[in-house]
Amino acid sequence: MITECYIKGRFDYGVGKCAVVITEDVPKGEEKKVLHQVAWRVPESWEYNGETIVADQFNCEILAATYALQWCMKNHKQLVNIYANTTTCQKWYLRREFPESRKASAQAYIDMLEAYKKAMDEHDDTEVVDRVFVEYIKKDDKNVWNWLVNDIALNVK
């Protein structure tokens, strides 16, 4: 079971970077076990839903958050709270609401959560919900997972 998911998005000197660390739940007093850890450079801009998104601090962070949520759902069938490196963004992730000026940047994150909500609305059994959602992120060419891996060139498994 996943206990924590930390993300970091940075934009320094014209270079965007993302990092994600996901840890496993362990008994109190034991050292946390890292389940997954990845970092990557971000292109200057990218496309999602016909919108051009330019790399900046927030956009790097939302990209990391989207990846983290996707990985947790795909590999552990578990939604998680995301701990961000900025308190403003942290509030947005917890509420899952974003200011209007950031809607285009956050659309991939929002789309993924909407797909999960739709699966929950259609099925009562949590195992079925998880399976429906995981199948969605594995097979649809236009989904967020493939967009992250292919369009953003984040070649992780």
Regions found by a protein language model. Give the residues of each.
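RNase H catalytic domain
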Residues: T66, Q70-I152
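Glutamate identity and glutamate-enriched acidic tracts
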Residues: E4, E24, E30-E31, E44-E47, ...
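Short amphipathic alpha-helical face segments that pack within enzyme cores
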Residues: N59, L63-Y67
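RNase H-like nuclease fold core
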Residues: M1-N59
